[in-house]
């Protein structure tokens, strides 16, 4: 049985109406810029040697990439974000 969640605003609560952005720590900034540019059609709204802000809509940025090349890969059983998803109106 699926549970239908009534939006918080409809329940009289103050809640975001959409997610603003996500910031990701990356080891290879240029590789990630290329990946998000290709997969999400995101464009750079600001970048320097250590950070890039990218957007695919009218927001300043939806994805912030912060270069930290010294980071180690997390252990397989470490806590952290597993995934995020993006909705498309049409793939055609």
Spans of features found by a protein language model:
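Short alpha-helical
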Residues: 31, 60, 92
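Vicinal oxygen chelate
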Residues: 1-13, 18-27, 74-92
